[in-house]
Curated annotation (Swiss-Prot):
<dbReference type="GO" id="GO:0005739">
    <property type="term" value="C:mitochondrion"/>
</dbReference>
<dbReference type="GO" id="GO:0045944">
    <property type="term" value="P:positive regulation of transcription by RNA polymerase II"/>
</dbReference>
<feature type="compositionally biased region" description="Low complexity">
    <location>
        <begin position="697"/>
        <end position="713"/>
    </location>
</feature>
<feature type="modified residue" description="Phosphoserine">
    <location>
        <position position="471"/>
    </location>
</feature>
<keyword id="KW-0805">Transcription regulation</keyword>
<feature type="compositionally biased region" description="Polar residues">
    <location>
        <begin position="727"/>
        <end position="739"/>
    </location>
</feature>
<dbReference type="GO" id="GO:0003677">
    <property type="term" value="F:DNA binding"/>
</dbReference>
<feature type="region of interest" description="Disordered">
    <location>
        <begin position="447"/>
        <end position="493"/>
    </location>
</feature>
<keyword id="KW-0597">Phosphoprotein</keyword>
<dbReference type="InterPro" id="IPR036388">
    <property type="entry name" value="WH-like_DNA-bd_sf"/>
</dbReference>
<comment type="subunit">
    <text>Homotrimer. Homotrimerization increases the affinity of HSF1 to DNA.</text>
</comment>
<feature type="compositionally biased region" description="Polar residues">
    <location>
        <begin position="778"/>
        <end position="794"/>
    </location>
</feature>
<feature type="compositionally biased region" description="Polar residues">
    <location>
        <begin position="1"/>
        <end position="16"/>
    </location>
</feature>
<dbReference type="Pfam" id="PF00447">
    <property type="entry name" value="HSF_DNA-bind"/>
</dbReference>
<dbReference type="GO" id="GO:0043565">
    <property type="term" value="F:sequence-specific DNA binding"/>
</dbReference>
<dbReference type="GO" id="GO:0003700">
    <property type="term" value="F:DNA-binding transcription factor activity"/>
</dbReference>
<dbReference type="InterPro" id="IPR000232">
    <property type="entry name" value="HSF_DNA-bd"/>
</dbReference>
Amino acid sequence: MNNAANTGTTNESNVSDAPRIEPLPSLNDDDIEKILQPNDIFTTDRTDASTTSSTAIEDIINPSLDPQSAASPVPSSSFFHDSRKPSTSTHLVRRGTPLGIYQTNLYGHNSRENTNPNSTLLSSKLLAHPPVPYGQNPDLLQHAVYRAQPSSGTTNAQPRQTTRRYQSHKSRPAFVNKLWSMLNDDSNTKLIQWAEDGKSFIVTNREEFVHQILPKYFKHSNFASFVRQLNMYGWHKVQDVKSGSIQSSSDDKWQFENENFIRGREDLLEKIIRQKGSSNNHNSPSGNGNPANGSNIPLDNAAGSNNSNNNISSSNSFFNNGHLLQGKTLRLMNEANLGDKNDVTAILGELEQIKYNQIAISKDLLRINKDNELLWQENMMARERHRTQQQALEKMFRFLTSIVPHLDPKMIMDGLGDPKVNNEKLNSANNIGLNRDNTGTIDELKSNDSFINDDRNSFTNATTNARNNMSPNNDDNSIDTASTNTTNRKKNIDENIKNNNDIINDIIFNTNLANNLSNYNSNNNAGSPIRPYKQRYLLKNRANSSTSSENPSLTPFDIESNNDRKISEIPFDDEEEEETDFRPFTSRDPNNQTSENTFDPNRFTMLSDDDLKKDSHTNDNKHNESDLFWDNVHRNIDEQDARLQNLENMVHILSPGYPNKSFNNKTSSTNTNSNMESAVNVNSPGFNLQDYLTGESNSPNSVHSVPSNGSGSTPLPMPNDNDTEHASTSVNQGENGSGLTPFLTVDDHTLNDNNTSEGSTRVSPDIKFSATENTKVSDNLPSFNDHSYSTQADTAPENAKKRFVEEIPEPAIVEIQDPTEYNDHRLPKRAKK
């Protein structure tokens, strides 16, 4: 058979969407009779023996689906003789099968109009070559025609050519309708619009289009899915020069075109169908056929177009030629071109994905840049805040240091001789009994007898060494090599005498040996929690008041006795501590310390080096272990007793703190002050003791109007203080078992009468050590027995800030704070009740 399969009317090709072959419905007898050709339709021109055994029946449309379908008239015999002549067959009127019911073009081939009627139609040739299941036959045009099924009861096959004409009023895809509505909506023109020529549309802003337009028409907001659907329905992106740039922004214009999607041509939308994948694109049509204006598809007859048996197999050569068959209803591409198209589409999709990723990365970089800037800003703000806080802390520390006393490391009689040499020698002694912990506190001192009787004592050994070195007959062997300081004193006699004199002077005038040790600690940056004070000197009277006169008698000191004799010290006044407004703290100049602490020869009488040498050489027999020591002690005590006696008398008379207190003069008749009377009430309003002592007062009771004592000694100069100072002593014989006069209890502002009742324990105040410059200030005043006590307490124990120090009875110089440097800063003192 030649081209029998190609005869008939034009068949539309939009019915190939179904994936499988469905069975044909059964036909009624009347319909079969109307359709079948008469028995003489086949002459002896061309008959095939293999087809005479059965009759092939065409695939006829079910009349129930198309009631108006009618059978075609019987053609004449000349029709078969002239089957090779091209002619248009219009004698068959067939209805197009609805989409998806009958798969006429199962493998993607359209029904082609062919006016070349062969002498035979679909005969048993189709039966001899049964169809292969869908997707398994490589012959693309083998199943392009309807298959005939055998009809029982007939011996001669009477097949006839059947063609299928499809109607054009089929439904459009939903995507096409939505896209058409989207473009014709005036509210969307800012984001999607027609091109100027009307043959394509443009998406102006992809980001806004995705978020505003797509959710209104579709169930997603994915632009990539929208582009994929456009490609499935035959749209192509119009490429421009900038489209492939990886640096293009998200606002690039996207332009798509489709030859059947034109502005104002809604009728062309029916020709837009969904394309198949790469495996089925060669079997599915890409356009809609027009039954009125069908175009013939020329086939290449080089493979044997004259032979009807080769008509079906000639489809391979048709697709291998690579022809693009275009028409109003149909557009085909060969297999190679379809593959290339899919590859290009995939590449474009990958490029779009890369572009999206690049945009996302750019946004991330911008965000990271902003975060980095914010972090730097916060860092600068934190740095500025840290700077301001540091400045505030510095101001706070300056303020705190301005309201605390001076941290001057000044000791009593500091500066006698060379302080460093004295401190080194005192520190080298291993018998003083000091225990310094990490904080630099001093625990306690040993008793006097252990201090004096200890053979390892550095002071007694130093005295012996000095005497031996000054002796005319001494030699190196006479020096005690076991002594701690012997090795250093062998070199120079004068140097040894000078050093020994310094040590003896320290013993005489210092109340406590711990003063020099604390000064040594201050020079070595050792910490000390003792409250610092400005120093001022006050001498203590050793002699009994009954024997205190112009020529006071001396009470010999028994070396072997271990009496509980206490040298009085300066107590601390709680009330004045609370009311005292210390002047602002200023850093201490270390250069002024030596001159400030240097011993004043006009104030005290000291043995010079020449005197010591002279006395040592002329009276060598008198220089035993204690002669040199006691000579100096007695000499200074004689002068200090007279001076202290005069001071005590003046204090009792001129004390402003006790205006109604009676003063009982229990002193001896040798008292030099004639103004003192027994049982006399003394009231000296407006008198300032410190002004009196310093001679700077303008009051009529000035020190210049008071006669000096008979001994010729002048009162000890005391610093000036504008506040009302009061001091009193109760001279009571027999109160002190050691023969000493009742001592003056003096703090940094007030001289108080320190009378103790019977049965009570007499306590001595703390010696006010000076803290080092670089140690922190502590308000606690540690003692040798009680190491700490807070001065901030409202009520303190009586002896909380006092301690006992066992020493030899000697005139003591006690350091008290000088109020002259902060007169203008002090608060008015309350009158003591």
